[in-house]
């Protein structure tokens, strides 16, 4: 949706939202898994990702990610998109097939939470 409606390259749109997934993709008992990997595998993978980034938890990785995005000028607020008036369209416009490669399933409520917190 960010790509097609607002003319962003796919990678730009992903970069703007990616920081929120450091926390979201840490499995807990309430989250459903996409694919055949189990929660233990995903948790271990996320912790390894945190270590590769030089941190030990999702919050520090998210903070680092968005500081980096700010330095290079990739911020959601710079897009001129009014989240309050466009959030439903943003959520409806997400390609569900692209979400299948995320290890944790996402629904419209999850997307709303992520977009609200950008």
Task: State the predicted function of each range.
Residues 4-86:
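Gly/Pro-rich interdomain helix-loop hinge
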Residues 83-118:
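Short, amphipathic C-terminal "tail helix"
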């Amino acid at each position: 949706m960010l790509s097609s409606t607002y003319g962003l390259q796919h990678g730009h749109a992903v970069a703007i939202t990616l920081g929120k997934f450091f926390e979201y993709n840490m499995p807990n008992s309430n989250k459903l898994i996409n694919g055949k990997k189990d929660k233990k595998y995903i948790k271990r993978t996320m912790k390894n990702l945190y270590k590769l980034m030089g941190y030990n938890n999702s919050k520090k990785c998210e903070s680092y990610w968005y500081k980096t995005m700010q330095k290079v000028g990739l911020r959601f607020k710079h897009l001129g998109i009014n989240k309050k008036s466009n959030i439903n369209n943003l959520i409806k416009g997400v390609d569900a097939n692209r979400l299948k490669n995320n290890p944790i399933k996402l629904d419209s409520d999850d997307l709303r939470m992520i977009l609200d917190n950008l």
